[in-house]
Amino acid sequence: MKRRLLLISNSTNYGESYLGWPREYIKEFMAPTGVKDILFVPYAGVGLDEESLEKSFDAYEKRVKGVFSELGLNIYSIHKEADPVAAVKKAKAVAVGGGNTFHLVAMMHKTGIMETIRKRVQEGMHYMGWSAGSNVACPALKTTNDMPITEPESFSCLNLIPFQINPHYLDANPEGHGGETRQQRIEEFLTVNRDMTVVGLREATLLWVDDDKIELKGGRPMRLFRFGEEPKEFEVGSDIGFLL
């Protein structure tokens, strides 16, 4: 499959500036394209302004635009486009921001851009997403960590990769927390979806996909889950081509 993907676990590390750690990767990802204008999908950003979703999306666009402008890139948001599907068809690259994955998926289906983005990526359009934006590149949203604040018409997502990502993957619960660990939740998913593979993508890491090549980048290993198997660790630089 033709695809150029930058799938980022998280936007910001503790104590760092917004989109601080992945900036150089974003710059490197976009450099060969010569593309400067990137269509931004802000639909996961529901809590940036309490007055309305529209103002929340405005605030999200402004925040991301400030970072991307420092990289010589321009963000323009799909929520301001009269025809979202037409905007995707004309876009040279797309960036999908993090936040609530359920709201993101609901809006992507409602506006009709889910299938359109998939087709454009298959035609060569560059796709980047962080957190929820990496989740929607998967077959389904079922390995998100988010509260189901709204009900999408379908859990189906872009299906740009044949495996699931669990972004912000944590190895253990915070001290004193009595709920399930992230590993237990993923194992529950695999009990019901036994033919799927899940990548636990730790913070400060990303997956770089170039057609049928995939590479883990960042400063930490990833964790691979399959039903009936012990989880496996893969370091940066490991051969993970089998995922595709």
Whereabouts are the PLM-identified features?
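Hydrophobic anchor at the start of a short beta-strand
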Residues: 36, 75, 127, 222
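Structural motif
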Residues: 6-7, 93-97, 128, 165
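A general structural motif
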Residues: 2, 33-38, 91, 124
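Catalytic-core regions built around general acid/base machinery
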Residues: 90, 110-124
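Catalytic nucleophile loop
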Residues: 95-98, 121-140
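Portal/gating segments that form or line small-molecule/metal binding sites
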Residues: 39, 45-109
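C-terminal and late-domain segments of enzyme folds
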Residues: 2-33, 43-45, 49-59, 143, ...
